[in-house]
């Protein structure tokens, strides 16, 4: 998922896509131009070019007018980025947890006690006037007073998924 600072890169990528595939330079990309571009890139293999163009057009051309608008391309890119984040959320959350436990789990029991959790809480930049006990209760799903690796993993995963569903800017 992109942040506001990344939007200029996304904008540039979309502009480059339009420039690359807009063969007649009319500032729109048609399904025919996509096919012609793919045909060239696929060394004249019309079947592969047709299939690839068909998939792309059916996926990106939301209003089925045979053209790719800037909105359609950017929506497609944003949707793909969200899907990628969702697919990687579990793995990334596990990596986050492993790194966190290596750093904060002083007694190496693969869970954070209250002291360890408060340190994590402060490192995350939470408001110092917030109640770490309250946050601990939210993350501590089994209510045993500790935050286990699996509870941390679920929390990190949910944060990543929420980020993926949020607005680009």
UniProtKB/Swiss-Prot annotation:
Signal peptide: none
Pfam families: EF-hand_7
InterPro entries xref list: EF-hand-dom_pair, EF_Hand_1_Ca_BS, EF_hand_dom
Amino-acid positions noted as binding Ca(2+) 1 in the UniProt annotation, renumbered to this chain: 105, 107, 109, 111, 116
Gene Ontology, cellular component aspect: cytosol; extracellular matrix
Coiled-coil stretches: none
Gene3D superfamilies noted in UniProt: EF-hand
A molecular function (GO) term: calcium ion binding
Membrane-spanning parts: none
Binding site for Ca(2+) 2: 140, 142, 144, 146, 151
Keywords: Calcium, Metal-binding, Repeat
Domain EF-hand span(s) in chain numbering: 9-44, 60-83, 92-127, 133-162
Domain of life (superkingdom): Eukaryota
Name of the protein this chain belongs to: Calcium-binding protein G
Species per Swiss-Prot/TrEMBL record: Dictyostelium discoideum
